[in-house]
Regions:
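Short, charged beta-turn/beta-strand-edge "cap" motif at the junction between a beta-strand
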Residues: 14-17
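Ferredoxin-like alpha/beta domains used as RNA- or RNAP-binding modules
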Residues: 1-5, 12, 22-82
Length: 82
């Protein structure tokens, strides 16, 4: 499995379907994502790998805050026709 940490993904199932999220960490069958608004870095959302579609964009999660995360996702969403 390729490393998904830091990758922007699109949710394909659930209440957040269609939203962009950032993978903070991953294991064999799940990813833990945040968007800085509904799901903050302090309370990550556990999603199945089957329910997310990865993009080619990877961001640095080292010094990430909820505010920076919201800004990065908004910029990506505006520039993307994904």
């Amino acid at each position: 499995m390729e490393s998904l940490s830091g990758r922007i993904v699109r949710s394909c199932a659930g209440r957040d379907k269609g939203n962009f999220l950032v993978v903070i960490r991953a294991d064999e069958s799940f990813v833990y994502v945040a968007d800085g608004k509904e799901r903050k870095l302090a309370s990550l959302k556990k999603k199945s790998l089957k329910h997310v579609k990865p993009t080619n964009t990877v961001i640095d999660t080292e010094s990430l805050t909820d505010k920076k995360l919201r800004k990065l996702i908004a910029e990506f969403s505006a520039a993307s026709d994904f």
